[in-house]
């Protein structure tokens, strides 16, 4: 446990930031999984495109605000785009 008042405050702050970061990353994982579930279930392409757009928006936002690395956001967007394009060709 922290011995100084400032260390206690830093602990509180880091706990809050950690919870916020985990929540944002969890939202992203849920959006990506939702898109993958739609693809696996054979949903209509417009539904998959809506899920793709929402996932890409979240990726962009988290990448710009440094919740995830910008290159990771770009890589994930590319992977999702590839899935979407292959899904369109499969039908």
Swiss-Prot record:
Keywords: Ribonucleoprotein, Ribosomal protein, RNA-binding, rRNA-binding. One of its GO terms (cellular component) is small ribosomal subunit. Residues 1-18 have a biased composition (Basic and acidic residues). Gene3D superfamilies: Ribosomal protein S20. Residues 1-25 are annotated as: Disordered. Binds directly to 16S ribosomal RNA. This is Small ribosomal subunit protein bS20. The gene is rpsT.
